[in-house]
Amino acid sequence: MSFQAPRRLLELAGQSLLRDQALAISVLDELPRELFPPLFVEAFTSRRCEVLKVMVQAWPFPCLPLGSLMKTPDLEILHYVVDGIDCLLAQKVRPRRWKLQVLEMRDVDENFWTIWSGARLLSCSPEAMSKRQTVEDCPRTGEKQPLKVFMDVCLKEKFMDEDLSFFSGWVQHRRGSVHLCCTKVVNYSMSILNFRNILETVYPDSIQVLEIWNMCWLCMIVEFSRYLSQMRNLRKLFISDGCRYLLSSDSQEQLVAEFSSVLLRLENLQMLYVRRVCFFRGHLDQLIRCLRSPLETLALTYGFLEEEDLKCLPRYPSLSQLKQLNLSHGALRFIRLEPLRALLEKVAATLQTLFLVDCGIGYSKLRVILPALSRCSNLTTFCFHGNDTSMDALKDLLRHTGRLSNLSLETYPAPRESLDNRGRVILELLTPLQAELMRILREVREPKRIFFGPVSCPCCGTSPTEQLESNFCLWGRPA
């Protein structure tokens, strides 16, 4: 008999078991482990909740990827799954077969179910199955570890949604034996009180990405700093909208000192995004010097950088290996750009993405950074649109990109000579100027995706972040 035949028989046996729920529950301890996933899917689909509850207690794999089955929250099924786990946690001695360590609520492991489904099992060799079982059967060592529940948290409302509220309450009830692990936490509009409750529930070491879009209340800033300092594995920090109030110098210094002390504890931070946060103005040096590890990404956008802030950027080793730099909407019109040139020279070997969108950079300031920009040989994305730039300035800029052969996306403003008195593009004027710019560019290198003018093409509506069928989108026409 072939390997496929007994596999199919096992599936049929599992389906027949579900017709007799009492029998299915009674034989779970003797059920072959390879039958658990297809039987679980069948029970999930047919909503045999009591079977699911008992199957969780006998689950023979380290991870139960429930999130890839449950595309939308189902509180009834969640209650039964959690009840099954609670029954086990209440036992001093766990069953022999139970290996569950992780309840995965993110939609990240659909491959698990397809591998163990009939279609994929038919194509699996006995050797491959044996190898997979060997890896998953590795015994745990040491003391009993807490069960980990993995889920991402995106807070778009003032209050918690039902599934997050359910897990939060369960974790608080089972504190110590269950950890709520969230690699990504995003807060758009949740109130301070509810957000504090979330941060107190989530296991802080699990958070790798934290985005706060409403840092407008001073009390939130202070509260946030206290929790942030516990997130030792944080890799990405995004904070936005901290400019609602005019602060006294004492309050500003207090907030900067608070954040500085937090940054000292974030040893794994790699990406720092600061958007529309004005209390850093004039104090950026104090923050940058507290970074413990080299950053890969630095974004200071919609801010009001002072010249002293820009001067500090090339000084510190933590910014010497940048891959992404974004100073868009940074009002650089009245700031000397020699420090930016020094920073670009420092990161020329590593920089891959540079955003200088709508920074008020005219030709005189552009000339300051062009020599350094031309040495950024690994640059793949360069966005410069939104600046008031003449035709001569754009010609000079394009000629300086001759050695940037890795550029795959570049955006530039329409030349000033193609605009009306309200700053709107006149296509009849832009078309010949654009053709001339492309001719100059092709003399030094062959571009891939390039935009001149507004970010969205007025002819085809394409934005620079979309995949284009043609090599170029020059107002909807291949160049």
Curated annotation (Swiss-Prot):
GO terms for molecular function: ubiquitin-like ligase-substrate adaptor activity. It comes from the Eukaryota. InterPro entries: LRR_dom_sf, PRAME, PRAME_domain. Belongs to the PRAME family. Gene3D superfamilies: Ribonuclease Inhibitor. The gene is PRAMEF18. GO terms for biological process: negative regulation of apoptotic process; negative regulation of cell differentiation; negative regulation of DNA-templated transcription; positive regulation of cell population proliferation; proteasome-mediated ubiquitin-dependent protein catabolic process. This is PRAME family member 18. GO terms for cellular component: Cul2-RING ubiquitin ligase complex; cytoplasm. Transmembrane segments: none annotated. Keywords: Leucine-rich repeat, Repeat. LRR repeats lie at residues 15-38, 97-124, 179-203, 204-230, 231-265, 266-291, 292-323, 324-342, 348-375, 376-400.
